[in-house]
């Protein structure tokens, strides 16, 4: 069973969102998602300064099994990307909720937060998929 940290919010497409304060949010993929994808070999991240909209495909994670689009969980501006993934994409596998984060976004529409799942809701989604 996958680890689903209670302090995070989730999207049905298996991204997680962590509030950092000041309308800034860190985004990554869940432990469940990286387990399905397998060993990461490449991560294509958005550019700092990019404007993205809720639901946009804004990044790609590529594993030995498949390439998978990452969808924006919130609208806003990309303010940071995890450059460590250029040399070590496997961090997405080993540390999906910490060192394996993908990007940070400055949210432009806080009302979108209400569409995110809490840990209990995301766990229920995982239970349905099994």
From Swiss-Prot:
Q: What Pfam families does the database record attribute to this sequence? A: GCV_H
Q: Which PROSITE patterns match?
A: BIOTINYL_LIPOYL, LIPOYL
- Any GO BP annotation: glycine decarboxylation via glycine cleavage system
Q: Where is the Lipoyl-binding domain?
A: 24-106
Give the Gene3D superfamilies listed for this entry: 2.40.50.100
Q: Which UniProt keywords apply?
A: Lipoyl
Q: Does the keyword Isomerase apply?
A: no
Q: Which GO terms describe its cellular component?
A: cytosol; glycine cleavage complex
Q: What InterPro entries does the annotation carry?
A: 2-oxoA_DH_lipoyl-BS, Biotin_lipoyl, GCV_H, GCV_H/Fam206, GCV_H_sub, Single_hybrid_motif
Cofactor binding annotation: Binds 1 lipoyl cofactor covalently.
Tree of life domain: Bacteria
Q: Which cofactor does it need?
A: (R)-lipoate
Q: Which residues carry this modification: N6-lipoyllysine?
A: 65
Q: Which family does it belong to?
A: Belongs to the GcvH family.
Q: What does this protein do?
A: The glycine cleavage system catalyzes the degradation of glycine. The H protein shuttles the methylamine group of glycine from the P protein to the T protein.
Database matches in HAMAP family: GcvH
Q: How does this chain assemble?
A: The glycine cleavage system is composed of four proteins: P, T, L and H.
- The entry's protein name is Glycine cleavage system H protein
Upper lineage: Bacteria, Pseudomonadati, Pseudomonadota, Gammaproteobacteria, Enterobacterales
Q: Which gene encodes it?
A: gcvH
């Amino acid at each position: 069973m996958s680890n689903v940290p209670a302090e995070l919010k989730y999207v049905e497409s298996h991204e997680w969102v962590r509030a950092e304060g000041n309308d800034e949010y860190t985004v990554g993929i869940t432990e469940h998602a990286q387990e399905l994808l397998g060993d990461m070999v490449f991560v294509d991240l958005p550019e700092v300064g990019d404007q993205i909209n809720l639901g946009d495909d804004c990044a790609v994670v590529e594993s030995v099994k498949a390439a998978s689009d990452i969808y924006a969980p919130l609208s806003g501006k990309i303010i940071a990307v995890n450059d460590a993934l250029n040399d070590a994409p496997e961090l997405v596998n080993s540390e999906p909720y910490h060192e394996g984060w993908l990007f940070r976004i400055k949210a432009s529409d806080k009302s979108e937060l209400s569409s995110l799942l809490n840990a209990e809701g995301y766990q229920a989604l995982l239970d349905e998929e099994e």
